[in-house]
C-alpha cells in the first residue's frame, strides 16, 4: 500500500475491496494437550499431523538423539502429505478428517525412508473409501517455493540481511512499508 518512495502495484482500493474469509480453527490431540491452529489454506493442520506422528514415533524415555530424529521424521512425513493433499479449500476437497485420524497417523508413522530420501505422501484409501477415486496431481509449475534470504555488504562494509518466509520467493512480490506480503 506504500506509494513512495518505491511505489508498488498494490493500491488502497485493493485493500479496501479485500474480503476477509473467516474459517474455523481446527484442533487435534497431543498427549494430554489439545492443539488448535489455523485451517487451510494455511498449513496449521500439518502441525497437528507433526505432533500426532511424533507421539507415535517417539518411544517413552527415548534418548535425545531418538527424540530429535523422531521429530524430524514426523515433520518430513507430515509435509509430504501437506504438499500433496493441502490446497485452497475453496478449490479442492482437503481430506483433513482422514489425514488427522488416529488410524492414519498410526499407520503413517510406520512409513520408513532413508535420511537422504524424500518421503512420498501417504495412502489415504484404506481410511476413507470415498477417496479411492480421487486423484491429486503433483505441482508441475516451475516456481520454487521456500524462504528468501538476502545478505548485502556495501563498499564501506555496512551489512544488512533479510529473511522472508512467505510461502514462495518474496511472497506476492509486493512490497509494503518494509515487508513482503504473503502469497498464502
Task: Tell where the protein language model's regions lie, with residue ranges.
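Accessory "access/gating" subregions that flank catalytic or transport cores
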Residues: 1-40, 116, 125, 138-139, ...
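Fold-independent oxyanion-binding glycine-rich loops
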Residues: 38-40, 155, 163-165, 183-184
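A short acidic/small-residue loop/turn micro-motif
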Residues: 43, 167-169
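Protein kinase glycine-rich loop
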Residues: 49
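A short, polar/charged loop-to-alpha-helix boundary motif
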Residues: 169-184
